[in-house]
Regions:
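Short, well-structured beta-strand-loop connectors
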Residues: 186-197, 228-244
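Extended, charge-rich intrinsically disordered regulatory tails
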Residues: 235-253, 257-284
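Zn2+-dependent peptidoglycan hydrolase active-site motif and core
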Residues: 190-225, 253-258
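N-terminal export signals
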Residues: 2-21
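Ser/Thr-rich low-complexity repeats and stalk/linker segments
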Residues: 21-97
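Solvent-exposed coil/turn segments that connect beta secondary-structure elements
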Residues: 53, 69-71, 83, 95-97, ...
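Surface-exposed, glycine-biased beta-strand/turn segments
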Residues: 91-205
């Protein structure tokens, strides 16, 4: 198992790229790589800036999360500005990711290059619904204790960030981790949160559920055969939310597990077993 340490005024690398840093007023840990993230702790309700842009605010406990997408540059400056004018900042080195190619054949042509006008109109409606759901911004820090895998048993069949070729046609990168499992396997919430979307019959995703874990950190569960939650519902870590299926664009029963922080696609597997820093900063 990988461990992380928090060392004052320094960075620590302890196995597999797990990093931690602490400077007065700001503690960080996480996976600082493309597709990775940083958990942070600072002053309660401090504004958090990434490369000079205000993107989130710390919770009442001073906790926050930021993400680094597949194309993130080689560094990121994290700055916290407390309610009383105090500031703290760190610059993180973001490691490059390694993204293999994945070839998928045997998909219905309508799910790869749809041309039917009615279908295209339906896809546009579904994109709008998903976009709205991904704007969910629940206050709080349900991510603070990290994440579990959503399935008890599974086999990883496609890595996050891989460049896909579908029926011989190059497609956008795959922003999910595919977990093959028997049809009907129980999908469980990997962390506490609120359901931002629960919809069956999506053209590409089939049965789709989104969970908001706070501050714009949202996980997605695709291709479900059954959904057991409703939009707006609070869920707890380990609670059953649905069943594995092969609905939408899928060639076999599996769960496509995704994660977004605001508009950035993250690798959910990197967050499994991570916890936010425990250092507490009180207001001066």
């Amino acid at each position: 198992a990988r461990r992380h340490l928090l060392i004052g005024g320094a960075a620590s690398l302890v196995g597999g790229g797990v990093l931690a840093q602490e400077t007065p007023g700001l503690a960080l840990n996480g996976e600082w790589r493309q597709g990775g993230f940083a958990f942070g702790r600072t002053w309660p309700r401090a504004l958090v800036f990434v490369d000079g842009e205000a993107l989130t605010a710390a919770s009442d406990a001073g906790l926050f999360v930021v993400g680094f997408d597949r194309d993130a540059p080689g560094s990121a400056q994290i700055e916290a500005r407390g309610p009383n004018g105090q500031t703290a900042r760190r610059t993180l080195d973001i490691a490059p990711g390694r993204f293999p190619s994945t070839v998928v054949n045997g998909l219905p042509s309508s799910t790869v290059e749809p041309t039917d006008p009615e279908l295209l109109a339906r896809i546009r409606r579904e994109v709008l619904a998903k976009t709205e759901a991904f704007t969910s911004r629940v206050a709080g820090d349900d991510f603070r204790d990290g994440f579990d895998w959503p399935l008890a048993t599974y086999r990883v069949t496609s890595q996050w960030g891989s460049q896909r070729v579908l029926n011989g046609t190059p497609a956008r990168p795959h922003y999910g981790v595919d977990l093959a499992a028997p049809q009907g396997s129980i999908i469980r919430a990997p962390a506490d949160g609120r359901i931002a979307m629960a919809q069956t019959g999506m053209h590409f995703e089939g049965g789709l559920t989104l969970i908001d874990h706070g501050q714009g950190l949202i996980t997605a569960y695709l291709h479900q055969s059954r959904i057991d939650v409703t939009a707006g519902q609070r869920v707890s870590r380990g609670q059953a939310i649905g069943r594995v299926g092969m609905t939408g664009r899928a060639t076999g029963p599996h769960l496509c597990w995704r994660m977004k922080w605001r508009d950035r696609n993250l690798n959910p597997a990197l967050m499994v077993g991570r916890r936010a820093p425990e250092t507490v900063y009180n207001q001066p």
